[in-house]
């Protein structure tokens, strides 16, 4: 209904406008401004697009993904009078910032539009129609298996009308308005293809493209010389369809951006097309972006690393996203990071969101727990000549995650890795402040002063309380309190990694190595890793851990504990059994340690985290 009203109002305005407003050609600045106007429409309709997202999977993020792609365009490109330069800049910014299936299709659409434009200041109507026709073909080419009744169908119908109509008008506004009318009719048809049981549903990506076109039409009609971007949210409930949460065939939405020389799309397609579905590859022989739904993102990235240099990657859990949309368990969202070492099934149970740290070996980098698994990490750790480096998620990563979560939760509590280990807390707080200001949602960030399983226990207890109905402010206070009630004990085997990570002086490490001593570390009250004691055998370290647990918790009630290990499940199981004898309860879980801990303490290390009631 909204689109019909928009179209009628614009048609009336056009009839009242003067012939002198005719626009027969456009330059780079006008092209840029029309894109900014289209982007603004995406921003305004972000929540709506999320709500009607049912294809290819119902993960409620099409609006977020398109908005992120548009933000990259708006914030990166500087308009030039030369239309070729501006078009190329728009395409490159879209490729760099594209997110999700629809974002990458849009990026390929812009690449197709820009790739054949000659060095020129302006573009006439016929040229515009011709280049947009090429753009439509390129959008189809990006998909391994194009599906009708989706975004690409609307793009094709719109572009075809431009080609048909450019012979009968010399005005850009009239041309775009006529084509918009065709795009709206095409949009109505998409529901027949994507949801036979829900005729009112339209494809979210296609709807996003139509919304973008509306912004372009408004710009050319208004004749404004500049366009200001304002944050806004409009939800048109008339467009919301029935729930139609089809089964998700592959769990992870996986993306990567590669650079190289003579990158071959067909070779890349054959390399990974059997590893999932919804494969989209956009870009040029020098820069390519891929999108695939898969159950094994770590295997996809392992293959892609051999194809070109990966400079960006993203993985999203669509099962978690779908569950959040259809079965939200709390009004407060809980966010942590991949250093929390919580098993996947528990993350699902409590709907805990995590944001990955990045780990790199030289030029190769990976997303902790997503594009590199603990066993892969240990293998690289032992073989690589270079020591791994961990880095925090970017400010944009946090901003995107908070923007997404605020569309589903009343407020958010983030509980993160010790600020002494990473600058993550600062990035999270900056993003939280900015998103809270624009959305009006309360977001609090807690420094747990902990890591690995100690952080995990804090996060799990916070999530459990949120599901139990605890209010936001009390939850934040309790989360801080619980972080002070947990202790971590880490038994190490190899001192090499302790030296490289700066946890031991070279002299002390040499002494430990000479006498084959196994160090035992603890976290102090400030979250610093401290050498507590040592033994000549790992099992003696375990006895000392038991002694420390008894010393600290003999007269206290234990809330729970967990065991972590670096590729040493046998020792972890043994430690679990001896701690169970002391406490009278099994561990909450036994889990592989995150790459951040593994890189610091080395293979075969084992740790226990324990929290008092």
Locate predicted features.
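Gly/Ser/Thr-rich loops at beta-strand to alpha-helix junctions
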Residues: 60-64, 99-104, 206-209, 289, ...
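Glycine-rich oxoanion-binding loops at beta->alpha junctions
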Residues: 65-79, 83-90, 371-406
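N-terminal glycine-rich anion-binding loop in soluble enzyme alpha/beta folds
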Residues: 335-397
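Short Gly/Thr/Asp-enriched flexible loops that form oxyanion-binding sites at enzyme active sites
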Residues: 100, 107-111, 416-438, 457-460
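Mixed-charge interfacial surface used for oligomerization/domain docking
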Residues: 137-141, 153-156, 160-287, 303, ...
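Conserved short beta-strand edge segments in small beta-sheet-based binding/regulatory domains
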Residues: 281-282, 308-322
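Acidic, glycine-enriched active-site microenvironments
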Residues: 22-36, 40, 44-45, 54-60, ...
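Charge-rich, low-aromatic oligomerization/scaffolding segments with amphipathic character
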Residues: 296-313
């Amino acid at each position: 209904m909204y689109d019909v009203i928009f179209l009628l109002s614009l048609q009336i305005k056009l009839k009242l406008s003067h012939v002198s407003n005719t626009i027969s050609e456009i330059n780079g600045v006008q092209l840029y401004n029309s894109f900014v106007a289209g982007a603004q429409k995406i921003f305004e309709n972000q929540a709506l697009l999320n709500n009607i997202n049912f294809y290819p999977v119902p993960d409620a993020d099409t609006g977020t993904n398109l908005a992120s792609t548009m933000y990259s365009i708006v914030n990166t490109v500087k308009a030039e009078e030369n239309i070729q330069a501006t078009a190329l800049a728009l395409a490159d910014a879209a490729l760099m910032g594209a997110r999700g299936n629809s974002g990458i299709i849009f990026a390929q659409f812009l690449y197709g539009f820009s790739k054949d434009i000659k060095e020129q200041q302006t573009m006439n109507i016929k040229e515009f129609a011709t280049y947009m026709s090429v753009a439509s073909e390129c959008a189809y080419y990006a998909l391994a298996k194009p599906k009708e009744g989706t975004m690409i169908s609307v793009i094709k119908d719109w572009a075809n009308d431009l080609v048909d109509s450019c012979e009968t008008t010399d005005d850009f506004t009239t041309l775009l308005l006529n084509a918009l009318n065709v795009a709206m009719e095409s949009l109505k048809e998409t529901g027949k293809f994507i949801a036979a049981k829900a005729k009112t549903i339209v494809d979210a990506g296609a709807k996003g493209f139509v919304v973008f076109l509306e912004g372009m039409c408004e710009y050319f009609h208004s004749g404004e010389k500049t366009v200001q971007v304002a944050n806004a949210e409009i939800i048109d409930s008339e467009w919301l369809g029935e729930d139609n949460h089809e089964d998700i065939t592959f769990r992870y939405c996986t993306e990567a951006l590669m650079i190289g020389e003579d990158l071959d799309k067909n070779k890349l397609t054959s390399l990974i097309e059997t590893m999932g579905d919804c494969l989209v590859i956009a870009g040029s022989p020098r820069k390519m972006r891929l999108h695939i739904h898969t159950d094994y993102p770590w295997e996809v990235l392992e293959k892609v690393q051999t194809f070109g240099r990966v400079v960006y990657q993203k993985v999203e859990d669509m099962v978690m996203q779908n569950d959040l949309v259809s079965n939200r368990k709390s009004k407060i969202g809980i966010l942590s990071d991949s250093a929390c070492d919580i098993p996947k099934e528990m993350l699902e149970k409590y709907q805990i969101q995590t944001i990955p740290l990045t780990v790199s070996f030289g030029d190769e980098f990976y997303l902790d727990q997503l594009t590199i698994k603990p066993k892969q990490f240990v293998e690289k750790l032992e073989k690589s000549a270079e020591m791994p480096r961990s880095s925090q998620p970017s400010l944009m990563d946090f901003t995107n995650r908070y923007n997404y979560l605020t569309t589903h939760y009343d407020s958010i509590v983030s509980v993160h890795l010790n600020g002494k280990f990473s600058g993550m807390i600062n990035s999270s707080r900056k993003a939280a402040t900015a998103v809270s200001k624009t959305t009006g949602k309360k977001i609090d960030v807690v420094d747990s002063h902990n890591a690995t399983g100690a952080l995990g226990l804090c996060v799990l207890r916070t999530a459990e309380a949120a599901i139990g109905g605890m209010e936001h402010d009390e939850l934040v206070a309790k989360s801080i309190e619980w972080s002070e009630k947990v202790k971590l004990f880490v038994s190490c085997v190899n001192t090499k990694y302790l030296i490289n990570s700066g946890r031991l002086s070279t002299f002390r490490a040499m002494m430990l190595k000479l006498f084959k001593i196994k160090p035992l570390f603890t976290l102090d009250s400030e979250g610093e890793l401290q050498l507590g004691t040592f033994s000549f055998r790992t099992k003696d370290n375990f006895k000392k851990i038991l002694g420390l647990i008894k010393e600290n918790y003999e007269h206290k009630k234990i809330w729970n504990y967990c065991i972590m290990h670096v590729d040493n499940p046998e020792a972890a199981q043994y430690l679990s059994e001896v701690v169970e004898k002391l406490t009278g309860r099994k561990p909450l879980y036994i889990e592989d340690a995150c790459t951040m801990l593994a890189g610091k303490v080395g293979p075969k290390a084992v740790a226990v985290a324990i929290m008092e009631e």
